Amino acid sequence: MSSLCKTRLQEERKQWRRDHPFGFYAKPCKSSDGGLDLMNWKVGIPGKPKTSWEGGLYKLTMAFPEEYPTRPPKCRFTPPLFHPNVYPSGTVCLSILNEEEGWKPAITIKQILLGIQDLLDDPNIASPAQTEAYTMFKKDKVEYEKRVRAQARENAP
């Protein structure tokens, strides 16, 4: 890993441990030799209170490219979520995670995770990634909300 990438991820980890939003977690995975793998993180994002997502703790992986922070990490829900902006693979479709759109090297892990949390209850309908969730969100909001609440129960901590 480049020294810029390593330095930035070490600093991000230090900042996160010092100050992170309530209910979230983010930590580097363990490497095969038992050390920390700063390039791959396990993350948990809680559903926002007073939304259909409340009560769930949604697990993601963050994979950082060698070129981080010039290029954004890839964020994937594991297991994939039913959501208009989550591809069937679990990959999150969000402008700040796209080099050609909103990514800037100054964006922090904390900002990414808060952005994903906001996206859960406020999908970007202009950028659908999952046909079934998108269609249900547009045509049958009641059924969509029911499905989201069931998903929150399945993802309770």
Swiss-Prot record:
It is found in: Nucleus. InterPro entries: Ub_conjugating_enzyme, UBQ-conjugat_E2_core, UBQ-conjugating_AS, UBQ-conjugating_enzyme/RWD. GO terms for molecular function: ATP binding; ATP hydrolysis activity; SUMO activating enzyme activity; SUMO conjugating enzyme activity. Its EC number is 2.3.2.-. Residues 4-157 form the UBC core domain. GO terms for cellular component: cytosol; heterochromatin; nucleus. It is an enzyme of class 2 (transferase). CDD domains: UBCc_UBE2I. Its main location: nucleus. The active site is at C93. Pfam families: UQ_con. Keywords: ATP-binding, DNA damage, Nucleotide-binding, Nucleus, Transferase, Ubl conjugation pathway. Pathway: Protein modification; protein sumoylation. This is SUMO-conjugating enzyme ubc9. It comes from the Eukaryota. Catalyzes the covalent attachment of ubiquitin-like protein SUMO/Smt3 to other proteins. Required for efficient recovery from DNA damage or S-phase arrest and normal mitosis. This may be as part of a checkpoint independent recovery process. Belongs to the ubiquitin-conjugating enzyme family. GO terms for biological process: DNA repair; protein sumoylation.
